[in-house]
Regions:
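Acidic, small-polar-rich N-terminal luminal/periplasmic segments of exported/outer-membrane proteins
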Residues: 36-39, 44-49, 63, 92, ...
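Outer-membrane beta-barrel translocator/receptor signature
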Residues: 208-210, 221-298, 304-308, 355, ...
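Structural signature of Gram-negative outer-membrane beta-barrels, strongest in the C-terminal barrel
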Residues: 305, 409, 428-430, 436-440, ...
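Membrane-embedded beta-barrel scaffold of Gram-negative outer-membrane proteins
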Residues: 364-366, 370-376, 382-386, 553-554, ...
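C-terminal beta-signal and adjacent terminal beta-strands/loops
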Residues: 608, 712-729, 747-792
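Gram-negative outer-membrane beta-barrel transporters
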Residues: 630-722, 787-791
Length: 792
C-alpha cells in the first residue's frame, strides 16, 4: 500500500509540473580546460549585477529573469575575464557554457573569502525549502566546518556549545551524550544524519562533518514524530571533482591521539569520490577509563546526466569504551570523591558498532523544479558489561550491582521530495512536498546475574573491603523485539505575497505503528505477542514574515507536533498521542551589509494533554495502576533566545548567544504518583550562554597566525527525578550549580602546513552531568590538545 501511495503521489506532482508556468530562465555550466566542473565560481548577469555561484557540479542558474539581451560576466581572481551575450526568451530556458583556460593545479590554490550574513545563506536540509533563514519564520543555526576545525572539536557536545540553548543533559555510562533544547530531550528521534534519524545510543564522529544544522522548535512537519525542542542534523562531507585532501594528527592530555585522513578527487569526468578515516586511542582524566575508535566514511558522486546526480555514502563506526557511571550521589548530594576516581569493576567494558549506507538521487526537472529520492539503511549494535548504578550509603559503603546491556536496531528509511517555484498572479510560491517512510526493528536484551550483586566497596576508602577481580557471566532471560513502521505525507509552501510580506504554510499527516513481542528464555521458553499500537496525527504549521527592508525580518509562527504515549485509558484502550502547540515570534536583523547578524526569538511550547496516572478507574474506584492514564496534565516551556554573529574584519569571526528557558508542570491530577504542579523539570537549566572568538591574521609578517577563545555557561539545574505526590522519600532531585568553561587556542598556518593548540577549561571548573540519579559524570578538567595538519 505504501509503495502504491508513493507512486500515485509522484505521478500527481509530475502531472502538476506540466501545467506549471515557466518564465525566462538561464542555465549554465563552467568547466576547466581538463573538462572538470568548477564549483564556487561567481557569475554576474545584467546591468544591475545579479550574481550566482556554481554548485559542486559546476552548474548555475538564474530564474524568472527579464526577457531580452543580457551579458554574462565571469570575473574572479586567477581567471581571465570572460563575457558572453545571451538572449532570454519568455517561458524558455537559455543554456550557456564556459571553459576556463587555467589548469586544475592553478585553480585549486585560489581561496575566495566571502563575507555573507548567515541570515542570507540558503539552507536546504532542515528548512525543507531552499530558502534563506531571513525568510524562515523559525530560528535556525549552522555550525560550519570552518568553526569545527578552528575549535579542534572531537565530540559533538563541543560543536553544540556554539548553539545557544542547546546543551548536554546527560552522558549515561560514558556511552552516549544526550542533547536538550527548549526543555526537551533531542536524543531519541531528533538526532539526524543527512536528514535521516540517527540512533542516539552512540557518540558520533565529527571528523567527517561539513556542518551541523540546528532547527529550533518544532520540525514535525518535515520529520513526523519528533519532540518540539528542535532538530539536530549532521551533514557529512561529500565528494569533489577537485583533487586534494589532508592528513591531520591530534594529540593531547591523558594519552589522547587521533590521526585522520581525508582525501578526494575525480575518478572520471562524471564520477568523484571522497574517503574520510580516523582512528582514536585515549585514556581519560578518569582512572582506568579508555577509548579505542575506528571510523570510516567513503562516498561516491556520479553525474548521470547534466540534470541527474547520484550520491552514495557509507559509514562505519567501531567504538570500544569503558562504562563509567561517575561518582555517585548520597541522597541529594554528589559524592565527595576526586574527579579522577573510578568506582566500577576494572574489567568493565563496552562496544558500539554502527554502520549505515545511503543513496541520494537528485534530478533537475527544469529551471524551477527538482525531484529527489533518498534512502538509507542503518545498523546499530551496542553491548556493555560491568558494575553500575552508584548509590552508596552515607558512610560510603556501596554494594556494587552487576549489569549487562545489549541493544540492536536496524532502520530502513526512504524519502521522495519535490520542490520548485511558480507564480499565481503576483504571488511567488516556493513549494516543498513529499512522502517519507521508515521501518525499524529494535531488540532489547535482558540479562540476569546470580547473584545480582558483585561485591562491596567503600567509595572513600578503597582499602576497607577486599575487591573482587573475577568476571562473572550472565544469563539471557528475555529479548523484546519492537517493530516500528512510520509513514508521512507533507506539503509546505512559502508564499511571497509582496516583497515585504511572506507566508509559510504547511501540513503533515503522520502514521506510526509499533508492535513489541517478548521472547522469554527463563524459567521456560515462551513468546508473548504484543498488540499493535497505532498513532496518527496531523501537524500543521503557519508562519508570517514581514521584511520592511532587505536586512530586517520580523516573524511569527504556530506549529503543532505529537508525542506517542504508553499505557491505556480507564476503558483499557491504547492512549492517544499528546498534541503539543508551539508559538514563536522573533526578529532577524543584519547590520553593515551583513558584517553583524542578530536574531531574537521568543517562544512558548504547551503540552496541554500530558499523560498522567488516572485518579479513578472506570467504575469510580481509586486507581493505583500507573499504567492506567488520562491526558489531562500539562507542561509549558517558554523562553527567549538571542544569537549574534559578526565578521568585523577579514579573518575574524565572533559568535555569541544567550538563552532563557522555563519548563514546568502547569497542570497535574494531584493523585498519588502524579507530578507536582509548578515544579521545574529536571535537566532544564534556566540560563545558558556561549561566546567564541577566532582571528587569523591575513597579511603582514604575522600572516597565518591565529588566536581564539571560547566561553560556555550552563546555569543552575536539577538532576535526579522530579518529585511526585505521595513519594516515600522527601526529595528526589539533585541540585547542581551553574558553571562556566573557558577555552583558548593559538595556531599558525604556513603554505600547506598548519598547527593548532588548544587549552580547554583553563580555570579547571568542576561540575557534573547527571542521568536520573545513577550516572553522575564530572566534566573534563583542564586539558591540552594539539593538531598538526598537512594539506595536499
Amino acid at each position: 500500500m505504501i509503495a502504491q501511495i508513493k507512486v500515485l503521489f509522484l505521478l500527481f506532482f509530475i502531472s502538476f509540473l506540466s501545467t506549471a508556468q515557466e518564465t525566462g530562465s538561464i542555465e549554465g555550466k563552467i568547466i576547466s580546460k581538463d573538462g572538470f566542473p568548477l564549483s564556487g565560481v561567481t557569475i554576474k548577469l545584467g546591468k544591475k549585477i545579479t550574481s550566482s555561484k556554481t554548485d559542486a557540479n559546476g552548474l548555475f542558474h538564474f530564474d524568472n529573469f527579464p526577457i531580452g539581451i543580457h551579458t554574462i560576466t565571469i570575473d574572479a581572481e586567477g581567471l581571465k575575464r570572460q563575457s558572453q551575450e545571451i538572449k532570454v526568451v519568455a517561458n524558455e530556458i537559455t543554456r550557456v557554457s564556459f571553459t576556463l583556460e587555467e589548469e586544475m593545479q592553478t585553480l585549486k590554490e585560489i581561496v575566495i573569502v566571502i563575507k555573507e550574513s548567515p541570515n542570507k545563506k540558503k539552507e536546504t536540509v532542515l528548512s525543507g525549502l531552499n530558502i534563506k533563514p531571513m525568510d524562515l519564520p523559525q530560528s535556525i543555526q549552522i555550525v560550519s566546518q570552518a568553526v569545527i576545525t578552528q575549535q579542534q572539536t572531537i565530540r559533538l557536545s563541543e560543536v553544540v556549545k556554539n548553539v545557544n540553548g542547546v546543551y548536554v543533559g546527560s552522558a549515561r555510562g560514558g556511552a552516549q551524550e544526550s542533547f536538550w533544547s527548549r526543555g526537551y530531550d533531542m536524543t531519541a528521534n531528533n538526532m539526524l544524519k543527512n536528514g535521516f534519524r540517527q540512533n542516539g545510543g552512540s557518540i558520533p564522529e565529527v571528523a567527517t562533518l561539513e556542518k551541523v544544522e540546528v532547527l529550533k522548535g518544532s520540525a514535525a512537519l518535515l520529520f513526523g514524530n519528533v519532540t518540539p525542542g528542535g532538530i539536530l542534523n549532521m551533514v557529512t562531507k561529500t565528494p569533489s571533482f577537485t583533487k586534494g585532501g589532508e592528513i591531520n594528527f591530534q594529540a593531547g592530555s591523558y594519552s589522547f591521539y587521533k590521526p585522520t585522513l581525508d582525501f578526494y578527487g575525480p575518478l572520471s569526468k562524471k564520477m568523484a569520490y571522497r574517503f574520510v578515516g580516523t582512528y582514536e586511542n585515549s585514556g581519560s582524566f578518569r582512572n582506568n577509563v579508555t577509548r579505542d575508535r575506528v571510523y570510516l566514511n567513503p562516498s561516491f558522486f556520479y553525474k548521470v546526466t547534466p540534470k541527474t546526480d547520484i550520491i552514495i555514502q557509507g559509514d562505519y563506526l567501531k567504538d570500544n569504551w569503558t562504562p563509567d557511571f561517575g561518582t555517585g550521589v548520597i541522597g541529594q548530594i554528589v559524592a565527595n570523591v576526586t574527579r579522577a576516581t573510578y568506582l566500577g569493576a576494572l574489567w568493565s567494558n563496552g562496544q558500539t558498532k554502527q554502520t549505515s549506507l545511503s543513496g541520494l538521487i537528485k534530478h533537475q526537472l527544469n529551471s524551477d523544479w527538482k525531484l529527489s529520492f533518498n534512502s538509507s539503511f542503518q545498523n546499530y549494535d551496542r553491548i556493555s558489561i560491568g558494575t553500575e548504578r552508584i548509590l552508596p550509603l552515607a558512610n560510603g559503603d556501596w554494594t556494587r550491582p552487576l549489569g549487562q546491556n545489549k541493544a540492536t536496531e536496524q532502520i530502513i528509511g526512504s524519502q521522495i521530495n519535490i520542490q520548485g517555484t511558480f507564480t499565481t498572479g503576483k504571488i511567488k510560491h516556493q513549494v516543498f512536498s513529499g512522502i517519507d517512510s521508515e521501518n525499524a526493528l529494535a531488540q532489547a536484551y535482558t540479562f540476569v546475574f546470580n547473584p545480582a550483586n558483585y561485591d562491596i566497596i567503600n567509595i572513600f576508602d578503597a582499602s576497607k573491603f577486599l575487591t573482587r577481580t573475577d568476571i562473572p557471566t550472565a544469563t539471557t532471560t528475555k529479548i523484546v523485539k519492537t517493530t516500528t513502521n512510520r509513514f508521512g505525507v507533507y506539503a509546505q509552501d512559502l508564499l511571497s505575497v509582496t516583497k515585504q510580506f511572506k507566508v509559510l504554510a504547511g501540513i503533515r499527516w503522520s502514521w506510526q505503528e509499533a508492535v513489541a513481542d517478548t521472547y522469554n528464555f527463563s524459567p521456560q521458553n515462551s513468546i508473548v505477542k504484543g498488540d499493535a499500537i497505532q498513532n496518527k496525527a496531523f501537524s500543521p504549521k503557519l508562519g508570517l514574515v514581514y521584511q520592511p527592508n532587505p536586512n530586517t525580518s520580523l516573524f511569527s509562527s504556530y506549529s503543532n507536533s505529537f508525542i506517542p504515549n504508553t499505557g491505556v485509558t480507564i476503558t483499557n484502550e491504547p492512549l492517544k498521542p499528546s498534541l503539543i502547540d508551539q508559538y514563536e515570534i522573533g526578529i532577524k536583523k543584519d547590520f553593515w551589509k551583513g558584517i553583524l547578524s542578530t536574531n531574537l526569538t521568543l517562544y512558548q511550547i504547551t503540552n496541554s494533554n500530558l499523560a498522567q496516572t488516572a485518579e479513578f478507574k472506570s467504575d469510580g474506584t481509586i486507581n493505583i495502576d500507573t499504567n492506567v492514564k488520562t491526558l489531562n496534565g500539562a507542561t509549558t516551556s517558554k523562553g527567549i533566545e538571542i544569537d549574534i554573529q559578526a565578521k568585523p574584519a577579514e579573518g575574524m569571526t565572533i559568535m555569541t548567544g544567550y538563552s532563557y528557558n522555563d519548563m514546568r508542570y502547569t497542570k497535574t491530577t494531584g493523585v498519588t504518583g502524579s507530578f507536582i504542579e509548578g515544579d521545574r523539570l529536571v535537566r532544564t537549566p534556566a540560563n545558558t550562554a556561549n561566546f567564541s572568538f577566532f582571528y587569523t591574521i591575513p597579511i603582514g609578517k604575522l600572516k597565518g597566525l591565529s588566536l581564539g577563545s571560547m566561553m560556555n555557561y550552563t546555569g543552575e539545574r536539577l538532576g535526579g527525578y522530579n518529585n511526585t505526590i505521595g513519594q516515600t522519600i522527601p526529595d528526589r532531585t539533585i541540585p547542581l550549580n551553574g558553571y562556566t568553561t573557558i577555552d583558548v587556542s593559538t595556531g599558525y598556518t604556513w603554505k600547506k602546513w598548519s598547527i593548532l593548540c588548544k587549552l580547554s577549561n583553563i580555570t579547571n571548573e568542576l561540575s557534573y552531568t547527571v542521568h536520573e540519579n545513577y550516572s553522575v559524570n564530572p566534566i573534563a578538567p583542564r586539558q591540552i590538545l594539539t593538531s598538526l595538519k598537512y594539506k595536499f
